Amino acid sequence: MQTQIAAGRVFDFSHAVGRSAASGTGFRHPCAVATGTEADADAVYVISRGFEMIPNVHWNRTALGVRVSKVIPGLVSGEEELVTEFSTYGEDPGKVIWPAGVAVDSQGTVYITDEWMNRISVFDSEGKFLKCWGESGTGDGKFDGPSGILIDPQDDIYIVDTRNHRVQKLTKDGAYLATWGGLGRAKDQLDSPWGIASDSDGYIYVSDHMNHRVQKFTPTGEFAASFGSPGTGRGELGRPSGVAVDPEGDVYICDWSNNRVQVFAADGRFVT
């Protein structure tokens, strides 16, 4: 085990899960992960985007490795157990082209965003396709590049609508509830947002990719705080992507252009 101490906090690295592979317990360009419900707590769902080539190019139609893997991590590297694989490459219902986000609701139902098909595909916990909803557009309940996805304790769904520069809130059946954001640099506007997470108080954190910050909102979309500013220094961000919140309320941000993870307190103070 590798231990790192930063800002008085201890971070223990245990082991890696997976390897480069187009099937089985390995992954091909993994981009998102979600844990199962309490009844399925040992499992994780991992999205592989495959070779990340441009769709509709004849030599890439198979898009080797695109899929969702349900895996039970072992206690050490190499002991992973593959439960199932599902949602491979394609345009038919139940298939994906550019999967981007994954989330699991309270009943164990799995939701996958597809930023190419502009839809959300829904599966049971074993990967059986149930339905899909969403379509291309700029109106309510329509998408242009859905990416990050979050499900709250009431099973309402928040989807980062990247190229529409907004967050949409919907029911688990896809019925539209609310929208916030819009293209801009103001404190409640977004530019190509990507990741999304929530804390135990219900606040929602969105990585505002091209504004080089993470914004904090109430569950109804009211602005609460902003983390980071453009740059390479401590507490500065370059095109942040993923975001997560731990049980203590600390916010972990994937600082994409700076090739690092930074940690902030819930009020936006830089930690490490």
What is each residue range found by the language model?
Residues 1-272:
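Eukaryotic scaffold repeat domains enriched in small/polar residues
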